[in-house]
Design a protein with these regions (language model features):
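Hydrophobic positions on the alpha1 helix immediately C-terminal to the Walker A/P-loop
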Residues: 376, 380
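The conserved Walker
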Residues: 368-369
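Helix-rich C-terminal or lid/interface subdomains of diverse kinases
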Residues: 292-357
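Hydrophobic anchor at the beta1->P-loop junction of P-loop NTPases
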Residues: 363-365, 391
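Conserved ATP-binding subdomain of kinase catalytic cores across diverse folds
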Residues: 8-239, 244-321
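Conserved lysine of the Walker
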Residues: 373
């Protein structure tokens, strides 16, 4: 099998039958049709939703950064997936089931016989309680933010640490990781564009060069900061794939599932990087203010103020990772709707990555009195993740006058004179 080529397709077709799965999988109100098997496909796995259970089968693929090309490798990855995910989803991951062929040649999950494949068995979580679904319905409040922060902070506090883990977050390792991922993103995007006959690139050479320069400069300039993070014990064996679709907000528990099982290098990381994945996804969905609040609360709870300075860098890197994954998913599908959606996602993620690497922007509004300058600026600020400064208040601040205190006519000239004299200090 060529590297990157999808295998075990015949087996996957046989698993589309309900008869292949255990009868004790139970029932679930979310199942749209009695006895139906619902299937979700990713670039690495196929998930079979059967009643109250989910069975996840890894594809026989070798994509370079992950190799599932042999049965032994897939079995090991299944075992690791259960072990690692039980840290944050102990009641969800039930174990690894062998997939065997019966005497008549029919495939079934579980039972006696020589395994032809393996599946991770999970409890089916309610789709309506996933974080992305709750956000879409406007059901997230301050208490929910606190629950998420407490769950992630507690997980990171007790996660495995040590020199073998720290090495994955050393400055040279971080630089190598982000630049290798960018190179892989270029290759994946190019293959995807060629496969679907795109006339414009998903990741343009100009944008790729911009990201390469930004990543190289940041990792070089911030080397002392990366080293301090190791000294401060901010590196751990984390989750590695914390996005809104992998968090389920249950009444009595926050469940984080589907962590990175296939690469220790990708899940051994700075806690800032683990959190940044979730923050980047919140930005993508239009909940930037929610993410900012979550990051601040996490920083305060963990007494980690320097975390916030690294978040934009990790957001940029992880958005690029998501862009590469979208390109790989699109290239691996022959279905036009999947390719179109994947291409849109890839372009969006690569653009989002670049947005975090852009230099600071100063945007000033001007106009006649009463022309809604402050109204427009106030509305734009949260959308641009910007600080809203009002000239009236800034002038008074420089003159030592309270924002709500009226300026006497005789003092007004002095306020404006001082503002004019110090305007460069205000802006720069």
């Amino acid at each position: 099998m060529r590297a990157g080529e999808y295998g075990n397709a015949e087996l996957h077709r046989e698993l589309e039958s309900r008869a292949a799965f255990p009868q004790d999988a139970g029932t679930d109100d979310a199942t749209s049709e009695a006895g139906a098997v619902e299937i979700i496909e990713t670039h690495l796995s196929r998930l079979y939703f059967v009643g109250a259970r989910v069975f996840k089968v890894k594809k026989a693929v070798d994509l370079g950064f992950v190799d599932f090309s042999t049965l032994e490798q897939r079995k090991f990855a299944c075992d690791e997936e259960v072990r690692l995910n039980r840290r944050l989803a102990a009641n969800t991951y039930l174990g690894v089931r062998p997939i065997v062929r019966g005497p008549g040649g029919a495939v079934r999950v579980g039972g006696a016989g020589a395994p032809v494949e393996y599946a991770v068995e999970m409890v089916r979580l309610p789709a309506a309680q996933m974080l992305d679904a709750k956000l879409a319905r406007g059901e997230i409040d301050r208490a929910c933010v606190d629950r998420i922060v407490a769950r992630l902070a507690g997980f990171h506090e007790h996660a495995e640490r040590g020199p073998e883990i720290d090495r994955f977050a050393a400055p040279e390792a971080v630089a190598r990781n982000v630049l290798e991922n960018l190179s892989g993103s270029r290759a994946a995007a190019q293959r995807f564009d060629e496969a679907c006959g795109a006339t414009a690139p998903s990741l343009s050479p100009l944008l790729a060069r911009f990201l390469e320069g930004a990543f190289a400069r940041f990792t070089a300039d911030e080397r002392p900061r990366f080293e301090r993070r190791i000294t401060e014990k901010r590196i751990c064996e984390g989750h590695g794939d914390l996005h809104t679709g992998n968090l389920c907000i249950l009444p009595d528990e926050v469940v984080a599932f589907d962590c990175i099982e296939f690469s220790r290098a990708l899940r051994c990381l700075d806690v800032a990087a683990d959190l940044a994945f979730l923050l980047m996804d919140l930005d993508r969905l239009g909940f930037r203010a929610f993410g900012r609040d979550l990051a601040l609360r996490y920083s305060q709870r963990t007494h980690d103020p320097t975390l916030l300075a690294l978040v934009p860098f990790y957001k940029a890197h992880l958005a690029c990772v998501r862009g590469k994954v979208a390109a790989l998913r699109g290239a691996g599908s022959a279905e036009a709707p999947v390719r179109a959606h994947s291409r849109s996602e890839a372009i969006g993620f690569f653009a989002q990555s670049a947005s975090y690497a852009l230099p600071p922007l100063l945007l000033a509004t001007s106009g006649l009195p009463g022309s809604k300058k402050s109204f427009v600026a106030r509305a734009l600020a949260p959308r641009l993740d910007a600080v809203h400064l009002q000239s009236d208040f800034e002038r008074k601040r420089l003159a030592g006058v309270a924002p709500t205190e009226p300026t006497a006519p005789e003092a007004r000239a002095q306020v404006y004179f001082r503002t004019k004299r110090d305007r460069c200090k205000i802006l720069f």
